Amino acid sequence: MRIEVAVILALLVISPALSSAGGEEGQNTPVGCQLSFDGELANESVQFQTSLGPRLPGSAASSALRESIKSNLTGWEITEKTHHVNGMVLTNLFATWNPGLGSTVILAAHYDTRGQAENDWNESRRDEPILGANDGASGVAVLLELAKHIPAMNLSHEITLFFTDGEDQGESFDTYALGAEAWADNLSAEEIDSIESFVLVDMVGDSNLTLRKTSPGDTELWNRTIDTILFFEETCGFGDSSYFNFDGMDYIYDDHVHADRLGIPSIDIIDIRYGEGAEFFGGHWHTHNDTADKISADSLQKVGYILESGLLTGDWLDARLPEVSEESKPEPLDNNPPDEEEDTEQDSDDMAVGVLLMGCILLVWGNLAWLLFADKRGEG
């Protein structure tokens, strides 16, 4: 009888300890790998948007898309602002989560499509507007899919999705990105200071996705983005990082330039080489071949993961580097960097758990051995 009791006692003591150890292992998946973005659903949005036809500023298709965006953002604070620019009526659409809570991260994409196809092989169609599956719909699709998952993140700051109008109606640099320019021109100094970062996604659906750093662009945000892409490959097992050209850089005039000129940390995540073997500003760009069949759910997912991970890990926060005078610089740190201290503390915790577990095992099995010995001698 005493042997049966001892065995039961051993199981009661050891099982919770083993379960605890196993539970800790399961909880060690880095938060940056616990992602929910669905590229297939984002691709469905691209197909819907292109089914509306070209989304020129002031058009019925543009209005229909805005209504669809709003219907997909239940619970978000929606704001529309209209601007009259160069004979066009531009409507910027903003969707905000956690309005008024701390500082703001802005994730942006343009929802208008180009009113001409000046690069199309068919000269007779160059004056016709394009469908803009990649140059228009892809960025919007990424933001809408990401928006489904933001409420569950329990973020402690404000998130604004900025759907810009009038980005793609220009003839030269100063006539592009008109909606974003109007937004920037109307910001107060206080509003500018409250914006942590401006992350733009544009032309991110190409099945031959190749991203690279763009200029102008915030160095700190780009460094974090590159670290995230490498982290996906090395830690999360999300595939290789070959879709990012780590050595290249493109100069891009896009919506982000207006945030950048105000000192807001900004980057433009864009693949301007649209199509297999395409050159800079080449391929299907500004042609009637910019259609939904050229879009890859996998490419949308790669970019969606970058944005989602950035929110979960705080990569889009605290990118502004404060100017520090010589007098106010802090004293040098000691020889234990923060991450080394954290590793030491974690190692100590793991050792303590191991010692406790081993102690429990030795105690129980020691008692069991004594009971077996006592039974043999008839002392029990």
Placement of each model-derived feature along the sequence:
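Active-site-adjacent substrate-binding region
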Residues: 197, 206-345
